[in-house]
């Protein structure tokens, strides 16, 4: 897992300037970019759509996460197309498509690749997200993760579109409705959101910057390690719901069965940027394989502490409007939802997750700051 084959040696992709005419700003110096006025549906339907989406993918891989506001015209089908194009245009394996959640057979939505992330009981969620957080032995800090790292071929790009938001803490604002495709073009689609929601935020942390904060000597040690990633909770949830795990291919021929575990390098190379970043940390990381059990526990706690306590590598994204969209590269960031809205309404989002390559480490790859000529 720590080595590299010749097939993995590829040149990083470079921006071609196709997004330069669109207003954008960086959310923090190292992480996050927002396009406040751009419309993803228009980009997908433009004559130069592939050029736009390729530059978008590179931007996401460099900046970690990109934000778009009020994407009322981005249907689920367009969102799904976008996620696949982001990967295809940047070299994902030809047999990688969209991830199918292991619990997809419970409350199927008609599209097994659309993951309904919701706290609304009317949507019959497969899991109680508030209960899951309350049962974490380390509290909310244990929520940090990268998507589907328990799969042999984990996620490249994830796209979350928020369609229902909780009210604010004072409870003064009406509950935002989930719009039908017809209603998206009605009064709600054209209305300004007077109540700027400051709840149900999502935190992102740069896996590039975490690695850059670690000394070169300790980085070399981490680069020799692999970790076992797993998610046993889904098997427990399927039993509680009297359902079953989706054991057929989940977006890749390699992602099959009910074991829901995989071994990956602790430090991996992002093939889009050529930069290496920390990968073995957070919720799904169960064991560092080349060290003792005690060393593994201490290492897991320290790496998570690096993410939690270094605020300069974090970005807190606020979901403010219906149909706000966040797209992130799971090879570049960790993320965690903030469950601070219990009793204030429900949050529902539609997420599509692209499946990428099997993680690898190119020993010749550089950290982000090394590649950009920046040094601490």
Curated annotation (Swiss-Prot):
The protein's enzyme class: oxidoreductase
Binding-site list for 2-oxoglutarate: 202, 347, 351
A Pfam family recorded for this sequence: TauD
Enzyme Commission code: 1.14.11.-
Region of interest: Disordered: 234-260, 354-376
GO molecular function: 2-oxoglutarate-dependent dioxygenase activity; metal ion binding
InterPro entries: AtsK-like, TauD-like_sf, TauD/TfdA-like
Transmembrane parts of this sequence: none
Binding residues for Fe cation: 145, 147, 335
Cofactor: Fe(2+)
Ranges annotated as biased composition (Basic and acidic residues): 239-249, 363-376
Cofactor note: Binds 1 Fe(2+) ion per subunit.
A GO cellular-component term linked to this record: cytoplasm
Keyword vocabulary terms for this entry: Dioxygenase, Iron, Metal-binding, Oxidoreductase
Biological function: Alpha-ketoglutarate-dependent dioxygenas; part of the cluster that mediates the biosynthesis of shearones, diterpenoid pyrones (DPs) which are structurally diverse meroterpenoids consisting of a diterpene linked by a pyrone, and which may exhibit a range of bioactivities. The alpha-ketoglutarate-dependent dioxygenase esdpJ seems not to be involved in this pathway.
Stated family: Belongs to the TfdA dioxygenase family.
This protein's name: Alpha-ketoglutarate-dependent dioxygenase esdpJ
Organism: Penicillium shearii
Designated gene of the protein: esdpJ
């Amino acid at each position: 897992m720590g080595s590299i084959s010749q097939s993995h040696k590829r040149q990083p992709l470079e921006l071609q300037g196709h997004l330069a005419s669109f207003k954008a700003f960086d959310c923090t110096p190292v992480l996050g970019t927002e396009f406040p006025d751009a419309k993803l549906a228009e980009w997908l339907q433009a004559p130069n759509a592939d050029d736009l989406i390729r530059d978008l993918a590179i931007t996401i891989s460099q900046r970690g996460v990109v934000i778009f506001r009020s994407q009322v015209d981005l249907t689920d089908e367009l969102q799904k197309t976008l996620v696949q194009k982001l990967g295809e245009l940047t070299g994902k394996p030809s047999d990688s498509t969209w991830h199918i959640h292991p619990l997809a057979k419970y409350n199927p939505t008609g599209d097994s690749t659309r993951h309904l992330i919701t706290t609304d009981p009317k949507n019959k969620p497969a899991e109680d997200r508030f209960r899951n957080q309350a049962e974490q032995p380390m509290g909310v800090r244990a929520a940090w993760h990268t998507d589907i790292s328990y799969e042999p071929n984990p996620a490249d790009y994830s796209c979350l579109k928020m369609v229902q938001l909780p009210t604010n803490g004072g409870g003064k604002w009406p509950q935002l409705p989930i719009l039908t495709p017809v209603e998206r073009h009605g009064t709600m689609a054209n209305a300004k959101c007077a109540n700027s929601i400051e709840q149900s935020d999502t935190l992102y942390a740069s896996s590039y910057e975490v690695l850059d904060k670690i000394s070169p000597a300790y980085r070399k040690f981490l680069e020799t390690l692999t970790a076992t990633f797993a998610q046993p909770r889904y098997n427990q949830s399927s039993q509680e719901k009297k359902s079953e795990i989706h054991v057929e291919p989940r977006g890749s021929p390699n992602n099959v069965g009910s074991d829901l575990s995989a071994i990956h390098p602790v430090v991996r190379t992002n093939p889009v940027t050529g930069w290496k970043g920390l990968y073995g940390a957070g919720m799904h990381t169960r064991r560092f394989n080349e060290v003792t059990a005690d060393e593994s526990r201490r290492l897991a706690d320290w790496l998570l502490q690096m993410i939690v306590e270094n605020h300069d590598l974090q970005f807190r994204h606020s979901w403010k409007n219906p149909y706000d969209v966040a797209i992130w590269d799971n090879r570049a960031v960790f993320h965690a939802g903030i469950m601070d809205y219990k009793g204030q309404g429900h949050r529902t989002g539609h997420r599509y997750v692209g499946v990428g390559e099997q993680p690898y480490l190119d020993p010749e790859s550089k950290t982000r700051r090394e590649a950009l000529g920046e040094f601490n």
